[in-house]
Amino acid sequence: MLGKQFLILSTQGGIRAPDGSPIALGYHTGHWEVGLLMEEAARTFTAHGAIPFAGYVSDPCDGRTNGTAGMLDSLAYRNDAAIVFRRLIRSLPTRRGVLGVATCDKGLPAMLLALAGSPDLPTILVPGGVTLLSQDAEDTGKVQTLATRFAREEVTLEHAAEMGCKACGSPGGGCQFMGTAATSQVVAEALGLTLPHGALAPSGAAIWLDLARRSALALLELEKAGTTTRDLLSADSIHNALVTHA
């Protein structure tokens, strides 16, 4: 245990077998494959003489709670999860830096809040990327209107069920339209908390895994240089994110 210790945090959900099949389902695709990013980062830390630790705070999905009381937890979750993430960070006092992995519109803002709330530590974010489009199906933006279209008798129940099942063309990643999830990934990159081109990589792709490896290497370099979140989050980086968002 003589190596420098680094903490990996994520929003992982579900239980994924090594072949990708589900032992237990997650709430959504956005947290289904992020464990692979954690594994890649952990192996990279180990290969360079560091000791990886890992912690988790999973996240829900509005796609499951629309029209139910569960939607009352949607916005509140971000603050609650950010608090728990920060408690996990403080609960490993020997950590030299934090690598956060998150994807969607609740887990990723929560992770950003937690990293921003750790100004004296080197931190980096690895976005969980996006799911791919399916052939002959509606995207994850359009399917959110299925309930309204069904209520207006514009589609049949059978069509709504089929489109809902086909919306995600791959098992991992966030919604592939520029909603809050994808926008949060872009804003995180604009803030300088991810590597360049870190946002919106296709989940499961080689470039997606390589991002985790390079992010772990970057965090090692940040720690070596004494560069912390306080140095990355500045008036200029926030201006850059605002311009990008606008």
Question: Each predicted region: which residue ranges?
Answer:
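Metallocofactor- and cofactor-centric catalytic cores in central/energy metabolism, strongly enriched
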Residues: M1-A246
